[in-house]
Amino acid sequence: MTANVLFPLFANLHDRAVLVVGGGKVAERKTEALLKVGALPIIGAPSLTASLQHWAETGRITWRQGTFENSWLQEDIWLVIAATDQPEVNHAAARAAHAQRLFVNVVDDIALSNVQVPAVVERGPLRIAISSGGGAPMVARYLRQQLESLIDDSWGRLTTLFAQRRDTIRARYPNIEARRRFFETQLTGPLQRLLRKQRHAEAEAVLEAALAETPPTGSGSVTLVGAGAGDAGLLTLNALRALNEADIILYDRLVSDTVLQVARRDAEQIEVGKSATGHSVRQEDIHSLMLQHARAGQRVVRLKGGDPFVFGRGGEELEFLRTHNIPYEVIPGITAALACAAYAGIPLTHRDHAQSLCLITAHCQSSLDTLDWAALAQERQTLAFYMGVAGLPTIQQRLCEAGRAETTPFALIENGARAQQRVLTGTLKTLAHTAQTYAVRPPALLILGEVTTLAEHLHWFGTAPLSAPCPPALIL
């Protein structure tokens, strides 16, 4: 065991005197942290920052004006923090503290310190401390930033709820194993989900019911999660959380393997995909699966490509769940138009080219027949057609008939935001020919409008856009 291995320890400094040697910005940050935990900071320095001066004038801190003196340690000090930019002063404070067997932290000096102040993530009473032992503080700070984004405020509220009922929980579950099982159930059950939704009163009722052994029936739930267009890196933090808490994942055919790989390993994954050529799983059967597993008390994730509310039938599924009193939540995803355009270097709106964006589903002939083609033929707008590979000849014909210029540029993005991404460009006149020449297959998104010309020099992901030569029959 090496000498610099630290023992993790949280200290109660409430109403305890802590000497901070230094009056600059670093000392100010340390003092602010001490004030948050109710400590009694004594600041020793010739001068103070404006904030430290204000705290001294308002009685929040005590100021010992001058250069460090050993007598400053004769005030029932519990901890010493040396935070000056003068090594000789820091050394003097550390030597004096060591002589009196006090804990001392010298900022950025491992050798002189016998305690380190860690990087901290705070959520109410919940505190997570990270330390590199003083050897690599930037690593600790980086990890803190990662945790800050992963741990939401609901964990602080949950900690408070448990703390308020600590004695009740211990009395109800005197056996430590039974108590552990109770906590595990609450940490992964509806209580936490309600807190995330800011439904605090309902969360308290759930906890009280659990303690009274009358948990509400049907405690399972369904979460509609947008999986984005393919790249697992585009999942939101809430989507990752839901996938890691799921018991059952009902996923669409177009959800990528890389997304499924980040899910909880022991979750059951069931494909419920559809295709343009035929429905492999009926929507009614998907409804039944959600209902069956939620009523069994399981956490169901309905994982959809893109965003659940953009051509994903998410609204229908929520209406069904509401009718059957199944708790639900929705986690949005990056819809295909946004992801594919971004990965192809195409701004969907642009001051010089397009002031509006229209998202269109083209998955079957009946969908195309109901569109207002005259409106879609207007200039200075971007059109994004979803699920339109089979309907490309019809799209080309109807837009041209409605007056959209044959020279209108397009980009056809196959496997957008995935390693296999391919971007094909051309003009409306050559749309169907380009798709046939390159044997385009779903998933593919059609973006039509002047903005697509920017892909030629703004592309950054994968290979450069391709363009099929115009056949003689199409040349005027």
Curated annotation (Swiss-Prot):
Alphabetized GO MF terms: NAD binding; precorrin-2 dehydrogenase activity; sirohydrochlorin ferrochelatase activity; uroporphyrin-III C-methyltransferase activity
EC number: 2.1.1.107, 1.3.1.76, 4.99.1.4
Region described as Precorrin-2 dehydrogenase /sirohydrochlorin ferrochelatase: 1-207
Superkingdom of this protein's organism: Bacteria
UniProt record, GO biological process: cobalamin biosynthetic process; methylation; siroheme biosynthetic process
Binding site residues for NAD(+): K25, V26, P46, S47
Residues engaged in binding S-adenosyl-L-methionine: G305, G306, D307, V310, T335, A336, M387, G416
Transmembrane domains' residue ranges: none
UniProt-listed PROSITE patterns: SUMT_2
Functional pathway: Cofactor biosynthesis; adenosylcobalamin biosynthesis; precorrin-2 from uroporphyrinogen III: step 1/1; Cofactor biosynthesis; adenosylcobalamin biosynthesis; sirohydrochlorin from precorrin-2: step 1/1; Porphyrin-containing compound metabolism; siroheme biosynthesis; precorrin-2 from uroporphyrinogen III: step 1/1; Porphyrin-containing compound metabolism; siroheme biosynthesis; siroheme from sirohydrochlorin: step 1/1
Pfam families xref list: CysG_dimeriser, NAD_binding_7, Sirohm_synth_M, TP_methylase
Region (Uroporphyrinogen-III C-methyltransferase): 220-476
SUPFAM superfamilies xref list: NAD(P)-binding Rossmann-fold domains, Siroheme synthase middle domains-like, Tetrapyrrole methylase
List of catalytic residues: D252, K274
Catalytic activity: uroporphyrinogen III + 2 S-adenosyl-L-methionine = precorrin-2 + 2 S-adenosyl-L-homocysteine + H(+); precorrin-2 + NAD(+) = sirohydrochlorin + NADH + 2 H(+); siroheme + 2 H(+) = sirohydrochlorin + Fe(2+)
Family: In the N-terminal section; belongs to the precorrin-2 dehydrogenase / sirohydrochlorin ferrochelatase family.
PANTHER family hit by this protein: SIROHEME SYNTHASE (PTHR45790:SF1), SIROHEME SYNTHASE-RELATED (PTHR45790)
UniProt-listed HAMAP family: Siroheme_synth
Protein name: Siroheme synthase
Organism: Xylella fastidiosa (strain 9a5c)
